[in-house]
Structures are given as structure tokens and as C-alpha cells.
């Protein structure tokens, strides 16, 4: 809801839901909580300086198993924050990001097992902060083209068999990858 510049975050509750958002323009905000066990979401953004902040089951009520989320954007200086489930309850989640533009920031905190997180990012000065936790078999793949990037990737599971791949083409940047399958602490 938006009235004269004021914004109220949405709150969607239910066992299973499908949400399709097509947002066009600059300086928009898409903020809210989703409480559902299975979410199918298509989020398309075309514009600059937009903000996307979503929490899926932040109170650990339903989980977020079998969710299929697609985030696509064309534009620059956008900020994306996604917190998906707690306690590895986003089992078999399929999360796909396609980002085209410069100076975009993705901050994703995903608690999953047997789930995938694929990011395809094209543009300069983009930042990715990914924290993937869960029991086992988390799959993270980042395919990036562009200069001056910043990646901070943490993937930790209780058991093992996680998979992580980063392919990046361009000049300059900072990359920190920590992967730990229940063993010793790691750091950059």
C-alpha cells in the first residue's frame, strides 16, 4: 500500500502460493514477508535504484520447501535482500537470479538442503553477499561478466555434499569464498 509517499510492507500467509510481480520504473520498493510452505514467485524489475526486500517464513512457521523463485532485473543501483526460511526448511528450493546492469547488490541468506541457487550477473561494480546454510547438498553457482565486482560467499552445512561454482570474467574485484561442511571453521 502506498499513499502520498508512505509505504506499508505486505504480509502474505498461506500453505501454497504463486506470486508474479512485474515492476517497471525507478526508485520503487517491494518489501514484505511471505509465510508459506511452497512459494512460486516470479519477480521482474526494469529500472534503477529499486529495492527488493523479502523474508520467506522468517518465524519458522511453515518452512519454504519446494519453492521456486525467479528474480530478473534490468537496471542499475538496485538492492535485493532475500532471507529464505530458517533451519534448513527451504528444502529442494530452486532459486534463479538474472541481473543485467551495474552497481547492483544482492544480499541472500538461504537456509536450504538439496536446493539450488543460480546467479547470472552481467555488469560492472556488482556485489553479491550469499550465506547458504542447511543440512546437506546445497548447490550454488554464480556466472558473472563485468569489472570491479565484490563477492562474499559463505556456504556451510551440517553434513556434506555441498556444491559451489563461480565463473567470473572481468578486471578488478574482491572474492571471498568460505565453504565448510561441518568441519573446521574457515575464513578469508
Residue ranges and their predicted role:
Residues 1-188:
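Low-complexity repeat regions of mature extracellularly deployed or surface/particle-associated proteins
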Amino acid at each position: 500500500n502506498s499513499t502520498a509517499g508512505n509505504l506499508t510492507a505486505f504480509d502474505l500467509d498461506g500453505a501454497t502460493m504463486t506470486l508474479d510481480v512485474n515492476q517497471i520504473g525507478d526508485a520503487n520498493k517491494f518489501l514484505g514477508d511471505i509465510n508459506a510452505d511452497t512459494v512460486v514467485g516470479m519477480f521482474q524489475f526494469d529500472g534503477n535504484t529499486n529495492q527488493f526486500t523479502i523474508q520467506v517464513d522468517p518465524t519458522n512457521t511453515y518452512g519454504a520447501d519446494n519453492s521456486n523463485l525467479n528474480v530478473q532485473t534490468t537496471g542499475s543501483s538496485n538492492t535485493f535482500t532475500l532471507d529464505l526460511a530458517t533451519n534448513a526448511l527451504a528444502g529442494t528450493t530452486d532459486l534463479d537470479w538474472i541481473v543485467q546492469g551495474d552497481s547492483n547488490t544482492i544480499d541472500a541468506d538461504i537456509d536450504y538442503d538439496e536446493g539450488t541457487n543460480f546467479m547470472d550477473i552481467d555488469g560492472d561494480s556488482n556485489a553479491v553477499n550469499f550465506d547458504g546454510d542447511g543440512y546437506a547438498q546445497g548447490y550454488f553457482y554464480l556466472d558473472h561478466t563485468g569489472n570491479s565486482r565484490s563477492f562474499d560467499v559463505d556456504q556451510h552445512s551440517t553434513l556434506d555434499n555441498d556444491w559451489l561454482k563461480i565463473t567470473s570474467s572481468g578486471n578488478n574485484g574482491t572474492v571471498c569464498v568460505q565453504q565448510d561442511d561441518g568441519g573446521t571453521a574457515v575464513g578469508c
